[in-house]
Amino acid sequence: MYTITKGPSKLVAQRRTGPTQQQVESRLGELLKCRHSAPTPQHPRAQPPGPWPLSSPGPRLVFNRVNGRRPPATSPSLEGTQEPYTLAHEENVRFVSEAWQQVEQQLGGGPAGESGPRPVQYVERTPNPRLQNFVPIDLDEWWAQQFLARITSCS
C-alpha cells in the first residue's frame, strides 16, 4: 500500500534562482551595443539556419544542485593536470599505431614478393553529385577566426 506524504516534496519545495530581469536586460543591452559597433567582416558568410547566429555562443548549460548540496570545490591546480594513462590504454594505442603503420606500408608498395591478403583501399565507383563541390574545412582554423572576430568586435 502506498502512503501520501503531507506537504510538498523536496523537489517541488526547492526554488529556482537566476539572474534578475534587470541583470538580463542590462547584459542584453551590452551585447547589442557591442554587436552594432562591430565592423563588418571582410568575407561575409551565409548564416546557417538555427536558433543562434555564428558569432554568439551557444546556450549556457546550468547544472542544478543535488539535494541542495554544493559541488566539491576543485582547486585550480587540478584542472590543468592531465588524466594519467593506464598501461592498458598505452598498450591499445601502441597496437593501433603499429597496425596502422603496417597497413600504410602495405598500401604504399611494401616488401615485394610477400604473399597473402593485402589491404584494399575503398574507391567509390559512382561519386555522389552533391559532393562534387565539397571543400573540407579546418575546424581549428574556423574556431580561431571566430574567436578573433569576437575579440576584435568587442574591443
UniProtKB/Swiss-Prot annotation:
Its main location: cytoplasm. InterPro entries: MCRIP. The modification Omega-N-methylarginine is found at R35, R60. It is found in: Cytoplasm, Stress granule; Nucleus. The modification N-acetylmethionine is found at M1. Keywords: Acetylation, Cytoplasm, Methylation, Nucleus, Phosphoprotein. Pfam families: FAM195. Interacts with DDX6. Interacts with MCRIP1. This is MAPK regulated corepressor interacting protein 2. It comes from Bos taurus. The lineage of its organism: Eukaryota, Metazoa, Chordata, Craniata, Vertebrata. The gene is MCRIP2.
